[in-house]
Amino acid sequence: MFPRFTAARVQEALTDTRVVLLTGPRQAGKTTLAQSLADEGRAYVTLDNATTLAAAKADPTGFVRNLDRAVIDEIQRAPELLLAIKESVDVDARPGRFLLTGSANLMTLPRVADSLAGRMESVRLLPLAQAEITAAGPPDFFVRIFAGQPPTSIRSIIGTGLVEAVLSGGYPEALTRKSWGRRQDWYLDYIDAVVQRDVRDIAAVDQLDRMPRLLRVLAEHSGQLINHTGIGAAIGLNHVTTQRYTAIFEQLYLIQTLPPWHSNALKRLTKTPKLHFLDSGLLGALRGVTPERVVQDRRIFGSILESFVVSELMKLAGWSGERLSFSQYRDKDQNEVDVVIEDRQGRIIGVEVKAAASVNAADFRGLKRLKEATGDKFEMGLVLYDHDRAVPFGDRLWAAPISCLFA
């Protein structure tokens, strides 16, 4: 069993919050984590069981009334329970009454956010990070960077090792498969399961058969500014339907759109979000990319690596305890920064991702523009690259190993 650094945050939330919602994509490890907490005096019920699900839907109030402290797995399958849970915790306001898990972002549903406002904390569990896979301990990346200290890496993963780590992804079940063919077969079967089960749970979709095809087209655009019209045209969907279906995949934690960073002082910034997949193994499987193909053509690896870094940064942010916002920078002169991270004090980190083993001054062009735009708020700009050395490139500008995110 892999260590999950999110566990400490969940346990802390259960000490002072009536309802804790653990959300993330199917098969990311939510059930395993929840079951470990169910051993601590909590009943465990799963709505993946047909009989249990039928009982919950038939009489939500009676179902919840019979539970004192409980873990309810896959809550998105019976959202009717949420109002009954609200009524229960309003009567008995002890912290840690309910730990819910869900394979969809229920907080995007107005009735959920309204009914449990002030009563529930939401914690996201994404697929395994590299630090969890290697059991290296939670990295102190954000602590160091916001303190103005250069990034360090105590475990060098470069070249072929980096490619294999990225394309393996972070789903625990996929990592048990020994061959690349078997691993990618798991990912493709996973997509079918998500479409047939999770999509049906949260949305009425008229053209369900288009969803796997749409996800493959989205995979080809990961790391790019999203164009719903162009993406939809590839599979015969209009702009509105494509946007709606894409939002469903985001609600299921398969993809993430990064909004553009904006400033009232700058008028020449693009306003289009950027698309990323939250698991690079899934992304690689949808594109049919293997380590052997990367050896033949390194160019196919760049955008997959960028999405991988975005996901790793989001996982680190989830453990850090800081509320960090993620965006991306791009101006009309084509200067860009892959990831802009801002804390509650307005301090900013810029991250650019390079699949190459060398970096030059030109790679910092976008970061320098961001630095000019943010002034004293600019904490550090990083170009993360495929090497094991951190190299300074000017005031608060560094080239650093991608593996500084791992340990």
Where are these predicted regions, by residue range?
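Domain-level recognition of nuclease-like catalytic cores that cleave nucleotide substrates
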Residues: 386-407
